[in-house]
């Protein structure tokens, strides 16, 4: 008997939406990354993108535990000498709350071209309005 190998044409991707209201950031991002990778499916294949599309609503209402709301710092580098920049969790939540969830989920996905294609299936919105109604997403309780 031959081993089953999934083909790109056989992959079925569904659309789901989740509500981030009063969810803990790390646990929430972990559950989303599993869905984006497709590890919840029987036909999961490590070298293929078998995951679903995820729409995250109410990103502005996400929670963090402890003192992370004040103390957590996000770093990035501009590429120039002395170009390290830092922003606190509170500052990012005021500017763009969706960015916090995107950073957390992106760190939990594989690095490389496969991870980038998985990350493109994540759509994050800071409120309840989204522009993917035509895809008829189903509610997913995380």
UniProtKB/Swiss-Prot annotation:
GO cellular component, one term: cytosolic large ribosomal subunit
Gene Ontology annotations of biological process type: negative regulation of translation; translation
CDD domains (alphabetical): Ribosomal_L13
Coiled coil, from the record: none
Record-linked Pfam families: Ribosomal_L13 (PF00572)
PANTHER family: LARGE RIBOSOMAL SUBUNIT PROTEIN UL13M, RIBOSOMAL PROTEIN L13
Family of this protein: Belongs to the universal ribosomal protein uL13 family.
Job description of the protein: This protein is one of the early assembly proteins of the 50S ribosomal subunit, although it is not seen to bind rRNA by itself. It is important during the early stages of 50S assembly.
Name used for this protein in its record: Large ribosomal subunit protein uL13
Source organism (scientific name): Buchnera aphidicola subsp. Schizaphis graminum (strain Sg)
Upper lineage: Bacteria, Pseudomonadati, Pseudomonadota, Gammaproteobacteria, Enterobacterales
Name of the gene encoding the protein in the UniProt record: rplM
């Amino acid at each position: 008997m031959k081993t089953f190998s999934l083909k790109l044409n056989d992959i079925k991707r569904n659309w789901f939406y989740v509500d981030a209201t009063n969810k803990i950031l790390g646990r929430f991002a972990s559950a989303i990354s599993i869905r984006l990778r497709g590890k919840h499916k029987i036909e999961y294949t490590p070298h293929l993108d078998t995951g679903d599309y995820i729409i995250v609503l109410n990103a502005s209402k996400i929670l963090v535990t402890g003192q992370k709301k004040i103390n957590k710092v996000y770093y990035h580098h501009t590429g120039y000498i002395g170009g390290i920049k830092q922003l606190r969790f509170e500052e990012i939540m005021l500017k763009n709350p969706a960015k916090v969830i995107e950073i957390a989920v992106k760190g939990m996905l594989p690095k490389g071209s496969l991870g980038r294609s998985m990350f493109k299936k994540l759509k994050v919105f800071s409120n309840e309005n989204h522009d993917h109604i035509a895809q008829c997403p189903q509610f997913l309780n995380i």
